[in-house]
């Protein structure tokens, strides 16, 4: 979609929401998890790799705040960091994800060590963080608008996983429940920023491209997991049966 004349705020929001057709809820890997066709290894691999994304989110949000001169925006945006890191003695989303890891049979060290993070996942997530560091704060903030589609994917896991995967412990689902309300709150703020900032056809086109970039990141993460856990072709599988890839955050 190429915008030639500036869209009204409502029409621009509709264009943003239309990008949901490319959300990773439609990826074959996620469809398999939803339908109960994923193996234990595939569920564990997803949880372990997605943890790298989870731990990068507060770094991304801190980068946005560092580039944002507006105190009112920073006061709102900081809540996203607190949601993941925790505050006032309450655990945040990262701790909740660690409990999800334990619920699917992984140890906390399995996740914290990052040894299961595939290179393709790491590259995709690092690209997101680097974009947030280098882009203007408005564009970086609006790259988070995949949150438009997040409540649906969290609810789909709550609806299907307990039925299909009774071996997953109930306490592992807290993260998905907590994000249902948090994501809706974040969407409201993010949409308001996007509609206020994108006041020309040029800016609207660029923001749609940025949202597609974020969708590409999420889709590419699942492509990497498909190669490793569905097709049994992890990196270097033709030369070794060991995990030979780098396992530390270098960026």
Swiss-Prot record:
The reaction(s) this protein catalyses: 6-(2-amino-2-carboxyethyl)-7,8-dioxo-1,2,3,4,7,8-hexahydroquinoline-2,4-dicarboxylate + 3 O2 = pyrroloquinoline quinone + 2 H2O2 + 2 H2O + H(+)
Any one Gene Ontology molecular-function term assigned to this protein's record: pyrroloquinoline-quinone synthase activity
Gene3D superfamilies: Heme oxygenase-like (1.20.910.10)
EC number: 1.3.3.11
Major enzyme class: oxidoreductase
Source organism, top-level taxon: Bacteria
Pathway: Cofactor biosynthesis; pyrroloquinoline quinone biosynthesis
CDD domains (alphabetical): TenA_PqqC (cd19370)
InterPro entries for the chain: Haem_Oase-like_multi-hlx, PqqC, PqqC-like, Thiaminase-2/PQQC
Pfam family name, one: TENA_THI-4
Keywords of this entry: Oxidoreductase, PQQ biosynthesis
SUPFAM superfamilies documented for this protein: Heme oxygenase-like
GO terms classed as biological process: pyrroloquinoline quinone biosynthetic process; sulfur compound metabolic process
Function text: Ring cyclization and eight-electron oxidation of 3a-(2-amino-2-carboxyethyl)-4,5-dioxo-4,5,6,7,8,9-hexahydroquinoline-7,9-dicarboxylic-acid to PQQ.
Family according to the record: Belongs to the PqqC family.
Annotated protein name in UniProt: Pyrroloquinoline-quinone synthase
Phylogenetic classification of the source organism: Bacteria, Pseudomonadati, Pseudomonadota, Gammaproteobacteria, Enterobacterales
């Amino acid at each position: 979609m190429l915008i030639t004349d500036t869209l009204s705020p409502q029409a621009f929001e509709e264009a943003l929401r239309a990008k949901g057709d490319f959300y990773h809820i439609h990826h074959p890997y996620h469809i398999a998890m939803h339908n109960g066709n994923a193996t234990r290894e595939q569920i564990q691999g997803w949880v372990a790799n997605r943890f790298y994304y989870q731990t990068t989110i507060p770094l991304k949000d801190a980068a946005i705040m560092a580039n944002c001169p507006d105190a009112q925006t920073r006061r709102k945006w900081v809540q996203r960091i607190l949601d993941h890191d925790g505050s006032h003695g309450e655990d945040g989303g990262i701790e909740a994800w660690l409990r999800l890891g334990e619920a699917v049979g992984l140890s906390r060290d399995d996740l914290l060590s990052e040894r299961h993070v595939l290179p393709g996942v790491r590259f995709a997530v690092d690209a997101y963080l680097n974009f947030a560091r280098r882009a203007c704060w408005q564009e970086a903030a609006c790259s988070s608008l995949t949150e438009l589609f997040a409540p649906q994917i969290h609810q789909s896991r709550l609806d299907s996983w307990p039925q299909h995967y009774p071996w997953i412990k109930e306490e592992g689902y807290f993260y998905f429940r907590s994000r249902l309300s948090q994501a809706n709150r974040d969407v409201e703020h993010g949409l308001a920023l996007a509609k206020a900032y994108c006041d020309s056809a040029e800016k609207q086109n660029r923001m749609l491209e940025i949202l597609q970039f974020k969708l590409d990141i999420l889709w590419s993460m699942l492509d990497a997991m498909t190669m490793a856990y569905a097709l049994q072709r992890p990196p270097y599988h033709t030369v070794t049966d060991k995990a030979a890839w780098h396992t530390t955050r270098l960026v």
